């Protein structure tokens, strides 16, 4: 399994809600998998029903804490944009000894024996960040990108539009390399961007610019979807038409910048104090 937000269990967690993955591995026969899955899910539902008040309290606190962090009323955390698997150490693990299936035409090439042996093995049970970025106050999208704003709304995110021109400090991501995957994954050649943020600069944001605040219960999801180095919308080609030869030119055209190779979503140092209207 992977820590990426596009997997359903992880996505629910990014929304500040609890999720548990249920999987029945294929080494068990079909009947056993069905029975074990039923019992596992029933046990979870019974536990949640018995602890419903605690679950609601924890999730409400997650909403509150995330909103405070985005607003700068609590320390803004460093959040992961890249990960690696990590081990809690080695432990003795009892394993059933398998033997070769004498039926070479069978689907299962190994079958279990009655022998159990214990091996000391590393237990990889979590992920750790290999690269982090600080949570910003929000993200600015070009006024022309209504389709992207609508996509964010489909995720339930608060998206606002500036009613007037506004000048403020922003962080701009300078792209050093764009690398598309050689093979498609679910119909997409995933895009990896590498680069860095320049020190905050003053930029003028025209009326109509979209602002997506992190001061909302789904603030972590905002970060996950819009950080250029992560596994969100940039990775899934949502910004591809703004990249390539016209990348810098487009960014400059929209925002009046003379810089090149700028990712066209800017990080807000603080929420704009300009009048703005929330999208329906």
Regions found by a protein language model. Give the residues of each.
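Hard-cation-handling environments
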Residues: 1-170, 174-175
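Surface-exposed loop/turn and secondary-structure junction residues enriched for glycine/proline
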Residues: 9-10, 14-17, 124, 165, ...
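Short, surface-exposed, polar/charged, turn-prone segments marking secondary-structure boundaries
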Residues: 48-51, 167-170, 187-191, 238-243
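Low-complexity, flexible helical/coil segments
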Residues: 55-62, 174-178, 195-201, 245-254
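A general structural signal for short secondary-structure boundary/capping elements
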Residues: 66-73, 182-189, 256-264
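Substrate-recognition/cap regions that form aromatic- and gly/pro-loop-enriched pockets
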Residues: 132, 149-213, 220
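Short, flexible beta-strand-to-coil junctions
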Residues: 142-144, 214-217
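Accessory, solvent-exposed terminal regions and/or long lumenal/extracellular loops of proteins
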Residues: 218-222, 226-280
């Amino acid at each position: 399994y992977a820590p990426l937000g596009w997997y359903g269990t992880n996505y629910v967690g990014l929304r500040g809600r609890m999720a548990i993955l249920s999987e029945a591995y294929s080494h068990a026969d079909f009947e056993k998998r069905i029975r074990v899955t039923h019992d596992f899910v029933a046990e979870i539902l019974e536990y949640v029903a018995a602890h419903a008040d605690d679950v609601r309290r924890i999730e409400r606190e997650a909403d509150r804490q995330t909103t405070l962090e985005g607003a700068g009323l609590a320390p803004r955390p460093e959040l992961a944009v890249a990960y690696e698997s990590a081990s809690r150490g080695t432990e003795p693990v009892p394993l059933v000894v398998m033997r070769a299936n004498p039926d070479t035409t069978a689907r299962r090439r190994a079958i279990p024996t009655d022998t159990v042996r214990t091996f000391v093995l590393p237990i990889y049970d979590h992920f750790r960040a290999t690269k982090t970025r600080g949570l910003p106050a929000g993200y600015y999208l070009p006024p022309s990108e209504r389709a992207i704003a609508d996509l964010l709304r489909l995720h339930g995110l608060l998206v606002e539009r500036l009613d007037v021109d506004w000048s403020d400090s922003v962080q701009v991501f300078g792209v050093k390399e764009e690398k598309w995957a050689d093979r498609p994954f679910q119909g997409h050649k995933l895009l990896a961007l590498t680069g860095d943020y320049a020190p905050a600069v003053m930029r003028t944001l025209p009326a109509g610019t979209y602002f997506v605040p992190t001061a909302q219960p789904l603030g972590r999801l905002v970060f996950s979807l819009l950080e250029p180095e992560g596994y969100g919308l940039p990775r899934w080609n949502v910004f591809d038409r703004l990249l390539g030869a016209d990348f810098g030119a487009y960014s400059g055209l929209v925002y009046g910048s003379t810089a090149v190779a700028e990712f066209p979503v800017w990080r807000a140092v603080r929420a704009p104090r300009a009048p703005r209207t929330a999208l329906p």
